[in-house]
From Swiss-Prot:
PROSITE patterns: CHAPERONINS_CPN10. The keyword Coiled coil does not apply. One of its GO terms (biological process) is chaperone cofactor-dependent protein refolding. It comes from Photobacterium profundum (strain SS9). InterPro entries: Chaperonin_GroES, Chaperonin_GroES_sf, Chaprnonin_Cpn10_CS, GroES-like_sf. This is Co-chaperonin GroES.
Length: 96
């Protein structure tokens, strides 16, 4: 994949979530929950502050993150893979 996000944007590949209920029923369609976990594939250079300096991002390529899929999150298909483009502000945690 050859994509470079700008500024504080991050490219995330969503991780698959278990598609079975606790009772073993396979969930499909709207009953299947979308995961809010993913792996960071690419990061921008950083957030531009008011004084013009660039603040490096906290997340790095390869980090597993938990994110909020909000208004600014964009879903794109790149090289046959569905990825999410979001601001670092939409990332709530890094899973360690």
């Amino acid at each position: 994949m050859n994509i470079r996000p700008l500024h504080d944007r991050v490219i995330v590949e969503r991780q698959e979530v278990e598609s079975k209920s606790a009772g073993g029923i396979v969930l499909t369609g709207s009953a299947a929950e979308k995961s809010t976990r993913g792996v960071v594939l690419a990061v921008g250079k950083g957030r531009i502050l008011e004084n013009g300096t660039v603040q490096e991002l906290d997340v790095k390529v390869g980090d597993t993150v938990i994110f909020a899929e909000g208004y600014g999150t964009k879903s794109e298909k790149i090289d046959g893979k569905e990825v999410l483009i979001m601001s670092e502000n939409d990332i709530m945690a890094i899973v360690e």
